[in-house]
A protein has these predicted regions:
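Active-site helix-to-loop segments that bind/position phosphate- or nucleotide-bearing substrates
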Residues: 1-17, 28, 34, 85-342
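N-terminal ordered "arm"
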Residues: 17-49
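A surface-exposed, charged beta-strand/loop segment in the N-terminal or early-internal portion
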Residues: 39, 47-120
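Short His-Asn-centered micro-motif
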Residues: 45-48, 69, 192, 208
Length: 342
């Protein structure tokens, strides 16, 4: 299934080029791999990885987007083909985004999905490990998020909803350490930080959020939506606000839960990270490959979509949510149904 196939290239010095209809990977003058381009939905290149113009053009024609990241996983650039989609759909998208009341309604649905999933994640950890000293605190944080969810209907404008999001984020990340089962001082999580991440947990979260952004943005573009024009996130030049909006539903249940799994199961530990002179904490090459492999495998897991009541791979959820948003904008649905984890 095309929407599950993202190629990650981490070998430094690798050169990607077109070989007939295939993508070829050359390292030190030797061709190591060949892949049919039409089977891919994305390519993500880390660090010193180069690509021929002919391959870039070929991938763009096949609707395969390419993202270039620094070796540590920071987003640098993106190459994509022409924008597709019905211009009428985009017009409706822009009109809705210009309507304060409609924007608030849409932002409320997105935020409801995010907070529901944050709450579900906290409750899952408390239920799975009731013997842990922090289980009571996790339940209390989940209850506080439930209270914030109940207040969302009373917020009539987007600024008030953003304030509620900030409050909920503080509650969630204050409780986050209680979901970590490791006690090593090197793995201590003292709050969300980025640019640069200052501890191993934040380093993994930042990398997973980058992967999530790639997949969500690609899904939105594939159905003809403009990833720059959002509802919950403010418009800003170069900022993919709609992609950031839709990401919110998936951060707690895909990226955050995966980070917890990688640490709690011992797949990552203190030795898998290095500290730069600036204080930035980055993954080793081997650790980065561990995260990539886990992400690929997770996208292949099957789940039941809560709105459609159909089973599908996790990797299809982003595309499905993009389709549901497009259906709402066309008037086929009364409201946008966020992804609610169970």
């Amino acid at each position: 299934m095309k929407y599950l196939n993202t190629l990650f290239v981490t070998t430094q010095g690798a050169y990607l080029h077109k070989d007939g209809e295939a993508l070829a990977i050359r390292v030190e003058g030797e061709t190591r791999h060949k892949l049919p381009a039409h089977t891919l939905d994305g390519v993500i290149c880390f660090g010193q990885v180069s690509m021929s113009p002919a391959l870039m053009g070929h991938l763009a024609e096949k609707d395969v987007c390419v993202s270039f990241l620094s070796e540590s996983g920071r987003f640098l650039a993106r190459v994509a083909g022409p924008t597709h989609g019905n211009v009428l759909l985009r017009r409706r998208h822009y009109r809705l985004a210009d309507d304060p009341e409609a924007t608030a309604d849409m932002a409320r649905m997105i935020l409801t999905g995010k907070l529901h999933n944050c709450r579900a994640s906290l409750r899952r950890s408390a239920r799975d490990h009731p013997e842990r000293p922090g289980a009571t605190a996790l339940k209390a944080a989940a209850d506080r998020l439930g209270g914030i969810i109940e207040t969302l209907a009373r917020h009539a404008d987007v600024d008030a909803l953003r304030g509620a999001e900030g409050e909920a984020g503080a509650v969630y990340f204050e409780a986050f350490p209680g979901m970590l089962l490791r006690d090593e001082p090197e793995l201590r999580f003292s709050g969300r930080n980025r640019r640069p991440p200052l501890d191993p947990v934040n380093s993994v979260l930042s990398l997973l959020y980058t992967f999530l952004m790639h997949d969500v943005r690609s899904a939105l573009e594939s159905v003809g939506l403009d990833p720059q024009v959002g509802f919950l996130h403010r418009d800003r030049p170069g900022r993919p606000s709609l992609a950031l909006d839709i990401m919110e539903e998936f951060r707690p249940v895909l990226a955050d839960r995966m980070a917890l799994t990688l640490f709690n199961r011992g797949m990552l530990g203190p030795k898998d990270f290095q500290i730069a002179p600036t204080g930035a904490v980055t993954l080793t090459d081997a650790a980065r490959k561990t995260v990539i492999t886990a992400w690929i495998e997770r996208k292949r897991d099957e789940v039941e979509h809560p709105f459609l009541r159909e089973k599908m791979p996790v990797g299809m959820l982003f595309f499905t949510q993009a389709l549901l948003l497009a259906r709402f904008l066309r008037g086929d649905l009364d409201g946008y149904p966020p992804y609610l984890w169970r």
